Amino acid sequence: MQGDTVVVQAIIHEGRVARIATLSQQAHPSITPIYFAAVRRQLWLGTSDWTLAVRQVRADPRVSVLIAPELRPHDPRIVRVSGHASARTDTQAQMLYVLHVALKYSLNPGQLRNTLAHAHLIRLRRRYHQQSAAKGSMCIIAVVPERFELLP
């Protein structure tokens, strides 16, 4: 993924939740927090095909994504990525996204310790994912960046 500066790339790398702004048919913005991964010079955000974010991306692909350096909570800088998005439901994209997300969120020492400390919540997490899957299929919002901005 190409960013304007090393700082922009670092914030994108350490960000945990992206906030995607999509537009309704009346051009009203909606903001949705979603887990994400940088994949093939794009931002991929994982969700379900029934969500408002996906419906709005399908109607109007213009999006902005905000990412903050969450590992440094006192750092006020935010990266805004503007671009066009598409909704992907193909198996290849899903598998690649799951791999990137597992490496980013689950398969690091800090997260492994956290998962073990909260093992009693695994059933609850599994039920949440089953309920979401019952409503629709997994979907990736793939954002092709056109502009990066470092906001103070």
Predicted regions and their residues:
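Amphipathic alpha-helical interface surfaces
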Residues: 8, 53, 93-97
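Short, intrinsically disordered, mixed-charge
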Residues: 58-63, 103, 107
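Secondary-structure transition/turn motif
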Residues: 48-51, 145-147
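A generic structural signal for nonpolar/aromatic side chains embedded in well-ordered alpha-helices
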Residues: 11-12, 57, 101, 143
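Short beta-strand segments
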Residues: 15-49, 55-57, 64-69, 77-80
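Charged, gly/pro-rich active-site loop segments
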Residues: 74-152
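Extreme N-terminal tail/first-helix region
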Residues: 1-17
